[in-house]
Amino acid sequence: ERYHRDLFYSANIYFDLRRLYANYNNCLNEKLDLELLHNIRPPLSIAEEIKINKTAKVHIIGVCIETRPDALDDEWLWRFRRWGVTRVQLGAQHVDNKILKKINRGHTIEQLLWAMKYLKDNCFKIDIHIMPDLPGATPEIDKAMFDYVYSVVCPDQMKVYPCEVVPWTIIEKWYKKGTYIPYFEKNNEDLIDVVRYSMTTCPNWVRL
């Protein structure tokens, strides 16, 4: 909570801070004197800082936070409201339960749909992360995934980032054993076609 409060606090005193330094660029290269900073005024409660920010010169128009579809509950939602969060990012990765289980994602498509409704019912904007070319996926499966996302999941924004083999992961072990070969490596045009499909079929109201 202190982190979020200080986001609004720093925006609210931004121009007061600039006046403390004859050359603002020096401020960026010096160790900030917290005592001097608090002489401007000490930070208030997060609710007070958010209220002040509504009319501040440096106005924070949105705060985005990332979580999992299976990690939401009333307590977390209350915290999001208190922290001034306006947009929530959900790591969905895929909409096929078989693929989600294979990669040990730990949640299901049903939990994603519940989280989407839960957040929208409480007036949050929602981003989701989608990952084509996961183990078990094919170009056809991934195209169907985007159809499902646009027609059923209905996010406000979506980030698409193809699966990447990274060190110290089970996917790397599968890759080295040859049990997982990204379809991009078999034919890179397949992945390009899938990403192109995600763009050309994307509704106007989804930010991609």
Sequence positions of predicted segments:
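Long hydrophobic segments that form regular secondary structure
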Residues: 192, 198-203
